[in-house]
Amino acid sequence: MRFGILILLTIFLIGCGNQHTQYRETTIQTIEEQNEETEEHVFTDALGRTVAVNNPKRVAALLGSFADIWYLAGGEIIASADDAWDDFKLPLPEDAINLGMTKELSLEKLFEANPDFVLASSNTKGNVEWLETLEAAGINVAYFEVNDFQDYLEVLRICTDITGRKDLYEKNGLAIQEQIENVIAQSKQRIENAGQAPTVLSLRASSTFIRAKNSKDNVLGEMLFALGCENIADSEESLLENLSIEQIIIQDPDYIFFIQQGDNEDGTKENIKNFIAENPAWSELTAVKNGRVYLLEKSLYALKPNDRWGEAYEKLEGILSNEEM
């Protein structure tokens, strides 16, 4: 189903790899699946630390996406960042503690929650800065990094090892992997039939900025790469620093994708509208002329979609194959 927004052109709002990261290959490999006598699970986290977890009862997550993964692994959360409620709509217990915004978490509130295990982000400076304090307090903490589906799958595997719910690893992990593999196979056939890969421009927009994103270290970029797309920001890195309409016109991508950052949806749409109005040459782009400019739903392409990763791939491939869902 399409939802139109008129901003000098129609942007369709859709509901909602192959590329290996060093983190996935080297820093989150499980060293020991399970010690049967102690139920202790030992693994290496994203900071290269050896972490041993023994049947935690009070788990806190410093990102909503990590809280979601823990739930998908059959666990419960006693404290998390506000996006666990606002973005992921998790069924947290009434007494769960809101630690605040992801970049402004309260260490005091975390201590109030009295966790025995904390899921933290190696990509978030504040999380990493808490490491020594948490270790000094005797609180077990593991750091993770998730940029694409394979990262998610590995974190889910570790979490289901800890919870003992390997059935949920099958349901929320391996089944999704099979779904994605089928979509990627379809994309290869699409490219073979077309004789060439589509070119794309990925733009992250908020109410105050619009920036180009390449294929690395972001959800949409990784998906587009896996589906065989050529992101013009990969070869024109200057676009990452300076969004030049002139350079975009020279590259003339087949598709343009906007993803929303932040919670101000109306402000984001207004900013996109103003960006287009200030650049009349925009209307000369092939993607615009062919109606291939899309505003993608935040929950599938800006946030970590976790068990909805397969759905996100399917909807994106639907656009690229002109069979939108």
Which functions belong to the PLM regions below?
Residues 126-129, 145-158, 196-219, 266:
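Extracytoplasmic ligand-binding site segments that recognize negatively charged/polar headgroups
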Residues 3, 15-65, 166-201, 318-325:
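Bacterial Sec-exported substrate-binding components of ABC uptake systems
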Residues 62-113, 117-123:
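A short, structured surface patch at a secondary-structure boundary
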Residues 2-8:
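Sec-dependent signal peptide recognition
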Residues 84-87, 211-240:
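Alpha-helical, coiled-coil/dimerization segments enriched in small aliphatic residues
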Residues 153-154, 158-161, 167-170, 258-325:
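Structured C-terminal subdomain patch of bacterial secreted/periplasmic proteins
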Residues 45-46, 97-107, 236-244:
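Short helix-initiation/N-cap motifs at beta->coil->alpha
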Residues 107-120, 139, 245-258:
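Proline-aspartate-enriched helix->loop->beta-strand connector
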